[in-house]
Amino acid sequence: MSKKFAEQALQELISDSFKVAIVRPPMIYGAHCPGNFQRLMQLSKRLPIIPNINNQRSALYIKHLTAFIDQLISLEVTGVYHPQDSFYFDTSSVMYEIRRQSHHKTVLINMPSMLNKYFNKLLVFRKLFGNLIYSNTLYENNNALEVIPGKMSLVIADIMDETTTKDKA
C-alpha cells in the first residue's frame, strides 16, 4: 500500500466525530532520535576541520514536532501539514555549533570548486551537504498552528544537554 493510497483512505474516514490530520515532516532530529543526526554529532566531535559548505535542509526538532502534534490534537483540526523549523539546517553550521558547545576549537575551510565537484559525486557527501528543503509556502498556517520558533544554537544546546544528561545516567 502506498502512502498516497493510505492517506486517501484515512481522509475518507473524516467526520464530525473523527478528525484526521496528516503530518509530513522533513528530517526529524534530536538527542535520542535514531538516524544520521547522532552520527553527525559524533563526527563533529572528532573533526577539528570542517568544510564550509552552505547547504540548506528542512528539518524539525523532535520537541517542536511533539508540540505541533499536541496543537493538532487540542484544536481538532484536519488537513495535511508540512511542519519544519523556522531555520534551515546548514550542516557546516550545525557541526560548528556542536563543536563550539563541546568547547572544541574548529576551523572552517572553503572547498575548492574542483574538489567540491568530486565530492558531490559521493553519496555520503551529498547526504551530509546536499540541499533538501520544503518550500516555506508549502506549510500555510491557516489554523493558528505553529512550529515553535527557535534558533539553531539554542536547539543544539538543548540536544547537547540531553545527550550529556543521558551519558551521565
Tell what function each PLM region has.
Residues A21-R39:
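Flexible, glycine-rich beta-alpha linker
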Residues K63-S74:
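Two-component system phosphotransfer/interaction surface
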Residues L72-K127, P149-A169:
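Mid/C-terminal beta-alpha module of Rossmann-like enzyme folds, strongest
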Residues Q42-L60, F68, H82:
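A conserved pocket-lining segment of Rossmann-fold NAD(P)-dependent short-chain dehydrogenase/reductase
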Residues V20-I22, I49, H82, L108:
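Conserved active-site beta-strand element of glycosyltransferases/polysaccharide synthases
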